[in-house]
């Protein structure tokens, strides 16, 4: 796991996954060093990852007060229950639907839950975190937030981009990605993660894009993109094009078999 600071108040815990035929997808969690510290998502649920151990290199888990779960997919909840054990004062910020989805894997203690809906806000001591639903998402439980002190939007899956190399997936600045490559990757991800974008009312969809524009964030932090500093206009312009981008169709069984055959060692002569 690649761990680094972005700005004064935020630590990025960066991981990534390779999706064959798509690219290297960043998988970020964050620590917001507020007066009441907030962990945003809890990493991948793979057996060789130890999210709590990595997190402990950044902050004592006993000091954590909030775990903001942007949605309950496994690339966001990998360390959740271990972190609840290690951080006895922390409460999980999620929605009613989020609790329901999580409970299909393991019961979530309701005294450790704080239900928050889009449009509401959370006081974390020295700032308020304003909850919103991002324009693009793959889960009805998705809730991002805007930190009015650092002028940062935490957007969950929205604005994600599978990248051509692992090094780019690890970079600490989305400006390292050429603009045309970033645009193409974000449009691909929009159609992988939110295929419904092709069937919604375009005018109403663009209103949700403008809602981010009205916040005018300096930084956009997506789970699946390196930190985007000073790129808000560029990223919103790309998001506005998502309904007209090519729909994504994944490999079928024949393509999978061809892919697996390519991995087989050549027969001896």
Give residue spans per PLM region.
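Short, flexible loop segments at the rims of nucleotide/cofactor-binding pockets, characterized by
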Residues: 15-21, 43-45, 68-71, 129-135, ...
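Active-site metal-binding motif and surrounding structural segment of the metallo-beta-lactamase
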Residues: 47-93
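Active-site neighborhood of phospho(di)ester-bond hydrolases with catalytic His/Asp-centered motifs
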Residues: 40-42, 64-72, 92-96, 153-156, ...
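Short, glycine/acidic-enriched loop or turn micro-motifs at the edges of active sites
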Residues: 44-45, 74, 160, 227
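Metallo-beta-lactamase
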Residues: 5, 93-222, 227-232, 241-243
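C-terminal regulatory/interaction regions
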Residues: 229-269
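Conserved beta-strand hairpin/beta-sheet module of binuclear metal-dependent hydrolase folds
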Residues: 1-55, 144-147, 151-155
